[in-house]
Amino acid sequence: MAGKDWEIVQEKAFTAWVNSVLDKRGEKISDVGKDLSDGVKLIFFLELISSKKFNKKYDFEPKARINMIQNVALALKFLDEELKIKVQGIGSEDFVDNNKKMILGFLWTLYRKYRIAVISEGDKSSEEGLLLWCKNTTTGYDGVNITSFTKSFRDGLAFLALSHKFEPESFKFQEFEAMDPIARLNAAFDFAEKGLGVPKLLEAEEVMRGTTDERSLVLYTSLFFHAYRAKEEKARLESSKNEMANRLAGLENSLESEKVSREQLIKQKDQLNSLLASLESEGAEREKRLRELEAKLDETLKNLELEKLARMELEARLAKTEKDRAILELKLAEAIDEKSKLEQQIEATRIRGAAEAQGLGLLRKNLDTHVHDLLKWQKLTMENSSSSSIDDQIIVEVSGLPFGEQVKHLATKLEAENLAIMKLLNQKEDDLKAQKLKSSKSKK
């Protein structure tokens, strides 16, 4: 069997197996290469086949690739640490990237663990136990002697015997003994599918030629084993149900022949009815409770996820608030620094103004003194002038001016007066010289 044909066989078988497990949670898949890629249904599947709870938090509706990889990684870690199953060579990316070959190998490992390793017959288990079970089940059928998976099923008689063993009324085995192997194989596959619900996974021509992969034969025959076990379990339940019904009918028929109190008979009937109803509803009630618990768990997990998102949003807001506060504190520090600089500038301006005012006052005092000195000179040198009128005139001239203009005006006035004094002194010296000269001439 070519590698591609083996993949097709596995895909059909594993899709049916995974769906039979996921049905307990109301889930299903259509493509094992794609529908397990986000890790959610993979986690459901591992929980159900192992009957162990997956306690890690994971993303129920992953959208981004990284979230899918994280989900699958958690599932593989659960498989390794909790279920103690080592699966070599497969990683999270193989599921996310839909690596069908690796995924089928992964499912084959789980199938061997949970569907083949549990098979036991006599002192044999797993594949050997399955082969022995096939041999014991077909004992007594003409032409059937099962010793290996690769050789004993090629003529179709072994598969036909397995189908006939549990559905003997559906066909007569002897009618197919004279057919060619391919016809027998196709007939056996059809009877198995219709009577036992075993899907048709193999090609009759390949089985007849002996090119079918041994794993495919092991996988296909294991479906017969589990179909028989399921049918036997169903038969046991039916037998128990019929036994209870017969006991109930027997009690009802004995009402007339036996002297049993009406109350006791009613009590026994109610007990049997209750027991019968309990047997009939046990499976449904268990499934109902499981679904309710799973629904509550899903709701709790969703609420936890919402709380997580709300907490993350609150933390983001808090971080933004802290950032804004830091910015405000920085601006406040800058404002305080600017205020300090302005206060220093104001103080420097005040000190400089006070110094300038003190200097201007001293200058004005000196100018006033100088003006009075000038007035005294004027009184000495100007015969027809009045000191009070000159003083008043200067005061009138500067009284309406600003302080700076007053200083400037007084300085100009002072300079002019100095020039006039110098001129007057020169004139007086000339007059004295002339008088002395005249006096000396008169003496001669």
UniProtKB/Swiss-Prot annotation:
Which Pfam families did the record assign? Answer: CH, Cortex-I_coil
What sequence ranges are listed for the domain Calponin-homology (CH)? 8-115, 124-229
Its localization reads: Cytoplasm, Cytoskeleton
Q: Name one GO molecular function term.
A: identical protein binding
Where would you say this protein principally sits, based on its record? Answer: cytoplasm
The family database entries (SMART domains) matched by this protein are listed as:
CH
Gene3D superfamilies according to UniProt: 1.20.5.340, Calponin-like domain
* Stretches of the chain forming a coiled coil according to its record: 227-352, 410-434
Region (Actin-binding) residue ranges read 1-227
State the source organism's domain of life: Eukaryota
Tell me which UniProt keywords the record has, alphabetically.
Actin-binding, Coiled coil, Cytoplasm, Cytoskeleton, Repeat
In the record, biological process GO terms are: actin crosslink formation; actin cytoskeleton organization; actin filament bundle assembly; actomyosin contractile ring contraction; adenylate cyclase-activating G protein-coupled cAMP receptor signaling pathway; aggregation involved in sorocarp development; bleb assembly; cell morphogenesis
State any GO CC term: vesicle
Q: What does this protein do?
A: Actin-bundling protein. When linked to F-actin the actin filaments form preferentially anti-parallel bundles that associate into meshworks. Plays a major role in cytokinesis. Negatively regulates cortical localization of rapgap1.
Q: What family, per the record? A: Belongs to the cortexillin family.
- Assembly: Homodimer; parallel.
Question: Would you tell me the protein name for this molecule?
Answer: Cortexillin-1
Species lineage: Eukaryota, Amoebozoa, Evosea, Eumycetozoa, Dictyostelia
